[in-house]
Each structure stands twice: as C-alpha cells, then as structure tokens.
C-alpha cells in the first residue's frame, strides 16, 4: 500500500507515544476527521501526542481512514520469568526456528503451520526468547492440558510454573493457560475474566487456533498493543467470516 509508513507511531520519553509524519498536511487531515478524537495535542508540525492506551484503536481507525500506520513504538518486556527449551532427544526443525525468528523480529504476528507441524513447539520457542510471564489462550480445557504437557516435556518449566484458568480452576501463575470460553463468559453483563489480563505484567500473549479467536477476546486484547502477541493456526480462514 503506497500510503503505508507515511504516518508512524513512535515511543516518546516525554509523551509516551506520538504519531508522526514528514507531511504535516496528513496530520492536519487526520486531526479533523474521526481519527482526531483519538489524538492528543499537536507537538509540532510533524508530531501529535497520543495516549498509549489508544494505540490499538488508533491503528484500527488509521487503517479505516486509508492511512495505515507503521508501528515503531516497540514492546515492553513484561515480568521476567526464566524458561529454556529442553532439547533432550529432539531439536527445533529449521522451519520452526525460522517461524520463531520471524515472529520475534516483528514482535507480533500470526504463524501459519499445517496440522502436526509443531505449532506448540513454536510457541514454546517464542516463550524461551521472551523470558517472561506468558498468557496462553486456547480453545478448550483439553487443548490447554495438551499445551501444559507439551511445555513440561519441551521446556525447563515445572508444574508449579503453569496455571490453568478454566471453568474448573482459576489459577494465575507465571505461565497461565486460559480457555476462550471462560474468558468470554459474562456475569451481570460484564466480562469477569478481564481481571486475568491485568493480573500480571504479561510479556507475551499466545493465541492458539487464532482463527477461532472470539470477537470479544480480540476486543479485550486489542488494547494490549505494547505486549508481544503470537497467533498460531493452520488456517487464516475464520469460521465466523
């Protein structure tokens, strides 16, 4: 897209986050439209302050306005937690290592691999790079326990490091595996599991079978733009269109 990169999001030591462009007229145009509601004060001809909490919404609105932003604001590391791959009798395959490196270089994205190609291993490798607390969102409890078993087999994590947040348990640990169903459950019109996203300073969020990601979960986590986020799937075709 020829307009991509003509507006950029950058971290700023004083303002937290800024939207910048080498073309002041673009910023003026955006300030007067719907995007303007998400913008702060004009710092100079080429720069507008932005509230960090609006990072996700602003990127969506810029895309709708025809000005897709290049996001150079980076990611926070989150709460540190040691983890390494335990390559005892096995090793990352070349394509798994390539997928992990490609994700890490961008900091956020989707890895598409066919069934049986080891998407969970790619997730574990990303966790080993992050060295931080990780929230893993899965389709159901069975998938969550498969993730737990695979992480215990493939990494240096212990059972005490991994928590299950499901209909049966509400454990929040350095590595927490939660089901989409429990995250989207409402009580008195409110998503009770919102506390899960704020319960720790997550450094990495992994979405298993991201093509099944419920819209409410997407909306909840779209505000977590400063966190590294990895989607894993065998297809990019969503079942709900």
Predicted regions and their residues:
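Conserved nucleotide-binding/hydrolysis micro-motifs of P-loop NTPases
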Residues: 54-56, 141-143, 170, 181-184, ...
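Extended alpha-helical interface modules used as scaffolds for assembling large macromolecular complexes
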Residues: 1-78
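Walker A/P-loop
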Residues: 105-130
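Conserved helix/coil segment N-terminal to the catalytic DExD/H
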Residues: 166-204, 215-220
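Conserved helix-turn-beta segment of the N-terminal RecA-like "Helicase ATP-binding" lobe
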Residues: 141-169
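Post-DEXD/H (motif II) to motif III coupling segment of the RecA-like Helicase ATP-binding lobe
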Residues: 203-204, 209-241
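Conserved pre-motif I regulatory segment
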Residues: 77-112
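Conserved RecA-like ASCE P-loop NTPase motor core of nucleic-acid helicases/translocases
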Residues: 133-140
């Amino acid at each position: 897209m020829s307009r991509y990169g003509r507006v950029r999001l950058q971290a700023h030591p004083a303002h937290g986050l800024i939207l910048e462009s080498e073309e002041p007229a673009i910023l003026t145009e955006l300030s007067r439209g719907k995007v303007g509601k998400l913008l702060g004060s004009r710092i100079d001809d080429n720069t507008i302050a932005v509230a960090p909490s609006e990072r996700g919404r602003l990127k969506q609105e810029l895309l709708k306005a025809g000005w897709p932003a290049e996001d150079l604001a980076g990611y926070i590391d989150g709460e540190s937690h040691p983890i390494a791959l335990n390559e005892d009798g096995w090793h990352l395959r070349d394509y798994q290592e390539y997928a992990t490196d490609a994700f890490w270089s961008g900091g956020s994205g989707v890895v598409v691999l066919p069934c049986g190609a080891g998407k969970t291993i790619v997730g574990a490798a990303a966790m080993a790079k992050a060295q931080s607390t990780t929230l893993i969102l899965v389709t159901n409890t069975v998938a969550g326990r498969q993730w737990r078993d695979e992480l215990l087999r493939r990494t240096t994590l212990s059972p005490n490091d991994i928590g299950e947040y499901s209909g049966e348990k509400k454990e929040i640990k350095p590595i927490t595996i939660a089901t989409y169903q429990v995250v989207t459950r409402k009580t008195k019109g409110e998503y009770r599991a919102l506390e899960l996203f704020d319960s720790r300073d997550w450094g990495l969020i992994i979405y298993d079978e991201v093509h099944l990601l419920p819209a409410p979960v997407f909306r909840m986590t779209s505000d977590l733009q400063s966190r590294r986020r990895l989607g894993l799937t065998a297809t990019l075709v969503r079942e709900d269109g």
